């Protein structure tokens, strides 16, 4: 088959293509795939991981925003392997249209660095989250999600209401083309049996977390007062009612503590604050 033309990675899309076959095999192995499962790959790029997934007995859908990739390298892969390609921005994808209605699926992705967090928010906190996600992110972002070194970031405080997370392994820049300037980590995100926040409240919960981290170097009382535009005395009462020390920093607040605070704020008459 004649090779199709592809102009190369696009910086604006955060493209760093994973070439390392050893890493690709490790990622897929950690997904614990069984015959007949539904698999969604986001950002298949040049199709290196797609090729391996498509050789398995799974129902594979690959979503790629880059039309040049879809018409070029991915068309070559699909010519000899069976899977579905959706040429679309995954952030605009209607999840009710993929696989069968109500069917479970697993998410596998080398996430684009520039929108990885937004993609995880959309999929993991929505009404149709994957049962398991094995994804690549910048190591620093991944560590903030899993509460490494006792520090929980915005994404960790948010996603912890929907999934259990752990870092599986790190990946060197040399495994990508072009190589990123930072180390990457592969995350395992397993869906909770019941989310701690209902999907219809996920957006407000995320905004509340952002408010709580508005001044991350300050004490939680000052950060929340600033983010929610409340008097420190009001925040002190909420913290006391939630059994949280007001001098702690936002990064030390656990997921369950964030949820307790959110529930308190949500019951206020002026809950439009969030």
Language-model features: where?
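Catalytic cores of RNA-modifying enzymes
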Residues: 1-211, 251, 260, 267-274
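An accessory alpha-helical subdomain
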Residues: 185, 189-191, 197-237, 242-245, ...
């Amino acid at each position: 088959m004649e090779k199709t033309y592809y102009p190369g990675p696009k910086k604006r899309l955060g493209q760093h293509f994973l070439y390392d076959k050893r890493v690709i095999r490790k990622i897929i192995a950690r997904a614990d795939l069984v015959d007949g499962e539904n698999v969604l790959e986001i950002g298949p790029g040049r199709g290196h991981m797609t090729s391996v997934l498509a050789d398995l007995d799974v129902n594979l859908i690959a979503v790629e925003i880059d039309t040049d990739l879809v018409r070029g390298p991915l068309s070559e892969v699909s010519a000899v392997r069976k899977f579905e390609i959706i040429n679309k921005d995954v952030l605009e994808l209607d999840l009710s249209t993929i696989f069968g209605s109500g069917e479970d699926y697993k998410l596998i992705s080398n996430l684009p660095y520039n929108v990885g967090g937004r993609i995880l928010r959309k999929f993991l906190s929505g009404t149709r989250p994957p049962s398991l996600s094995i994804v690549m992110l910048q190591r620093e972002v991944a560590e903030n999600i899993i509460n490494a070194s006792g520090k929980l970031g915005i994404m960790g405080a948010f996603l912890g209401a929907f999934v259990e997370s752990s870092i599986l392994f790190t990946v060197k820049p040399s495994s990508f083309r072009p190589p990123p300037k930072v180390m990457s980590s592969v995350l395992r995100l397993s869906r909770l049996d019941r989310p701690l926040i209902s999907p219809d409240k996920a957006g407000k919960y995320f905004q509340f977390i952002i408010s709580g981290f508005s001044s991350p170097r300050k004490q939680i009382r000052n950060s929340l007062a600033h983010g929610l535009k409340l008097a420190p005395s009001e925040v002190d009462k909420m913290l006391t009612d939630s059994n949280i020390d007001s001098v702690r920093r936002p990064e030390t607040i656990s997921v369950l503590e964030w949820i307790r605070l959110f529930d308190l704020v949500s019951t206020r008459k002026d809950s439009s604050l969030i």
